[in-house]
Amino acid sequence: MMQRFSIYLFSLALTLGGYAARAAGDTKAAELLAQARTAIGGDTKLSKVQGLSCAGALQRAMGDRQIAGDVTIDLQLPDKFLRTDSISPMGDAALVVTEQGINGDKVLRNSKTLNAPPGMMIRMPPPPAPGSDAEMQLLRNSRAELARLSVALLLTAPAATPLEFTYGGEAESPDGKADVIDMKGPGSFVAKLFLDKSNHRPLMLTYRGVAPRMVIQTQRGDGPGRGQDARTPPPAAAPEQVDINMFLDDYRSVDGVMLPHHIARAIDGQPSEEWTFKTVKVNPAFKADTFAPK
């Protein structure tokens, strides 16, 4: 499972081998980005892309297990993004559906359980309280994820999250060479985009962030007896920042735009998840409530 990670983890040498001497940053970065945009369709076609909907299979590492499911990524520029996961974490008919994303200044987060057997309850962590520091941090994280996906897929920074691009040098591994673009944005947003020198398409995007977590509690039977409370476990310690690498491949043309149909992530060098898209739609007609808080 996750066999393709062997290819991508091998290419992590790009980030470890050091970079060649840097050129005049902004000008070189602009030239490379223009070259990359031409490689995936050109400015005329890319400027017309205001939305994407990508749906397919999800594989995720969960402890020492691998779980499978479905994933949908909906993106509407300049400020809307929704990721929907549908998985069976217990390996049975119980299906956990989670939604997370952003609509302007509103965090989108929802979860529900379908087909849970009688006497079983699957509990997901509740969303942060409105106006809390946790909600503000989640809002920043969601904006950052929208920006990363927008750049990785369309080489476009969303207007809601303006980014600065500078040349980061050339990286090399036994797999080949890549041009490196450093990205900086609002707050502490920092990332690196690696462009394959052979075809100029996005190959990898690296950043530091909080590892995605899924905490699921199960309860069978009648639950706590009369007079007892269903106790919530104490809050976990603040998560630490980790190195996250996003790999992109299996490019195919969709309405004249070359888009990756396979995306994988590694966290601190270990396989985390991969998306294998069966359908990718450009400028889909989203339902009115797609990005509505639930």
What are these regions (language model features)?
Residues 172-293:
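Gly/Pro-enriched, hydrophobic low-complexity segments
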Residues 31, 38-118, 164-172, 185:
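N-terminal mature ectodomain segment of secretory-pathway/periplasmic proteins
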Residues 26-30:
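Soluble non-cytosolic domains of exported or imported proteins
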Residues 1-9:
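Bacterial N-terminal signal peptides that target proteins for export
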Residues 106-150:
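Acidic/charged, solvent-exposed loop-and-adjacent secondary-structure segments enriched in E/D, K/R, S/T
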